[in-house]
Structure formats: structure tokens, C-alpha cells
Amino acid sequence: MNCFSCFYFHEKKKVPRDSDNSYRRNGEVTGRDNNKTHPENPKTVNEQNKNNDEDKEVTNNIAAQTFSFRELATATKNFRQECLIGEGGFGRVYKGKLEKTGMIVAVKQLDRNGLQGNKEFIVEVLMLSLLHHKHLVNLIGYCADGDQRLLVYEYMSRGSLEDHLLDLTPDQIPLDWDTRIRIALGAAMGLEYLHDKANPPVIYRDLKAANILLDGEFNAKLSDFGLAKLGPVGDKQHVSSRVMGTYGYCAPEYQRTGQLTTKSDVYSFGVVLLELITGRRVIDTTRPKDEQNLVTWAQPVFKEPSRFPELADPSLEGVFPEKALNQAVAVAAMCLQEEATVRPLMSDVVTALGFLGTAPDGSISVPHYDDPPQPSDETSVEDSVAAEERERAVAEAMEWGVASRAHSRNPSAS
């Protein structure tokens, strides 16, 4: 059954933009017109009021818990600075405690003139109300009082992956190899659920380190669904969309054409996996010019497997299984293929990563998957060869994982 069929959206007037392309640089969308309203422009105010009424009609049909603005102001001590735990182009995030239940939550207060508008607000509430998975952040509820727009999430005590990988303070301990693979696997499983289990499929469209939240045990959950879109259904191969996302993470074909597929998310995942392997930001202007773009810098290394260890984050200090690192780099390279059709499915990625953890307790588990669909007669020779190469790499990763775990159980056998 289509889980989105019970919601009806009014067609809204599209607001003209200065540019057809929008990106987030350093976590923020660029190229967008904030379209601030002014009292001296009654038409704009009337249109905003009309949109607010339409938004209320949609949100009234959503089953998520509703909060009053007063309740959330109380929970966050009137949005005090001491409760602030994050901010960006969309607004601010506060840590709060719900008075009625005592639950600790994260409250995202959207900037009314910011980068996440009413449409993105509704998309996020809708998506997270209908999609439930252990690797998606849990939406507790929302507030749509007047022109206030707030989202209430479960509180993730470790913050974001960005906090622990790319914004380390001098006293922070770098993530070890197993934790990095655990985080990568969690994010991959979240994407796999969106692509393969949701009906219709959902394209996340904004995967990045800042949107991967971590609980106390460093389990990863995807957050911020304001840019998510329903994927193609039936005979359609893609959906067309105005280019949105974060600079450096967008798939090249989506950037060029605006044509969006689940393989666009696979590319973004490849970027995040490469960040986990290297400890580098995808775009870092503080580095030498030829190293500022992470993917461009890594591409020559992808062609020489003997050089894969060069990509390892120096903060790991060599403490990682070299073959597991090589397989992780191979997975990242496949995800970052220029041609979208030869990138792996997220189910392939989940399988491969599930065998690259080295924890003795086997805490990184791999769920059961159905057999992948067989290629049609119309599949090109190039696609078939690429699929075989992908399957071979996944098989090698699985073989390595089995051997590694067997060795950890019986080291004297080697």
C-alpha cells in the first residue's frame, strides 16, 4: 500500500527564485531568495496568510503530536542561550524538557525568514510521521501556532557526526575504526529503508555529516528531511527537481540536469564514507588548492589499490585492519562513480559494510535481504560488467569479514 496516499496537498503558487540552482555551503543553502514579507506589501502578506491556512489544513491531517508554542517555550526555558545546541540557515535547535512527561527532546525553531520554509516544514513533518526506522530520527511532534514553525525530535546525546569527525576539539578522542564503520552502516541502513522499503521510495537528498545524528552508543540516525522527495514510480526512471542540497555532496548528474534518483543519494553516501575514512571535509578551503575538494583529491588513488592506505585518517594512527580499509575505500569509490547507473544499490552497500566491522562481539549485524532483481534483456553489456564488478567487490568484502571474525575467535589457527 502506498503510505502517502491519504494526504492531499493544495497546489501552491511557486515563488520566483533568483537562480535555478541552490546549494548549501558549510551547511547552508545558497542561491535562495528568502522572500521576506513587509507590511507595506499587502498582497505578499495576504499570500502568506493563505499559505499558512493551507499548511494548517495539511498538518491537521498528520498524526504526529502537536504542541503549543507556550509548551515549547517552557520546555526550552524560553529558548535560552544555555539550551542552544545547534544552529544553521534553517534556524536554531534547543535542548528541552517536556513539562508533562519529563522527556528530554530537541526543539528545532525555524527562522521565519530563513532557509527552510513552510513547504519544507510540511515535508519534514509528513515524512517523519510516516517513516519509522531505527536509523531515522524519531519525530515527537510539531508546533504550527500562527507563523511559528517548530519541530520536536528525540534528543540525540552525541550530537552529529560532524561534531565527532570534522569539528574535533583538542580534548576530543577521534573516532576509532569500528565506530566509523558502525556509523556508516547505520546511515546506509537508513537510506536503504528509504529507497527499498518505503512505498513509494523516498530520496533523502541532503545526506551529510551534519545530518547524521548519534545516540549515546554512536548509533547513527538520519535527520532533517526538509529536502526529501518521493522517488520515481512505475516506468519513471527519475524525478525532476530544482537542484537543492549541500555543496560537495550533490551527485554530478543531479547538479547538471536536476534529474533525481536514489543513486543521487548513493553518491552522497560515498562522500560521507570517504569523510569517515579520511577525516577530511568534502570541501576544505584551508588545504592546498589540489586538496580542497575531497573527491577530486581521492580519485587518482581510487585507481591504484596499493595506495588505498594513503587515504586513512592520520588520527587513526594506523589502528585499523588494512584489508577492511581497502574494502571500505572500494565501496566509497563505487558509490562515487560519475555514471549513476554503475553505482551500487544501498542494499549492496549495507551488505559490504556489515562485514567490515571487527568488533569481537559481532555488534555490526547484517539483516536478511531478498535476492536482487535480475538484469533485463535490455541491460547493456557495460551495465552487466559493472554489476559483476560490484558483486565481486561485495563478495570480497563478505569473504574478508567472515575470515576476520573466524580469526578473532580462533587466533591460533593462523
From Swiss-Prot:
Native source organism of the sequence: Arabidopsis thaliana
Q: Listed GO cellular component terms?
A: plasma membrane
Q: Where is the Protein kinase domain?
A: 79-356
Which sequence positions carry the modification called Phosphoserine?
A: 240
Q: Spell out the InterPro entries in the cross-references.
A: Kinase-like_dom_sf, Prot_kinase_dom, Protein_kinase_ATP_BS, Ser/Thr_kinase_AS
Give the positions of lipid attachment, kind S-palmitoyl cysteine: 3
Q: Where is the composition biased (Basic and acidic residues)?
A: 17-41
Q: What class of enzyme is it?
A: transferase
Membrane topology category: Lipid-anchor
Which amino acid positions bind ATP, per UniProt?
85-93, 108
Active site residues per record: 206
Q: Which UniProt keywords apply?
A: ATP-binding, Cell membrane, Kinase, Lipoprotein, Membrane, Nucleotide-binding, Palmitate, Phosphoprotein, Plant defense, Serine/threonine-protein kinase, Transferase
Q: What is this protein called?
A: Probable serine/threonine-protein kinase PBL26
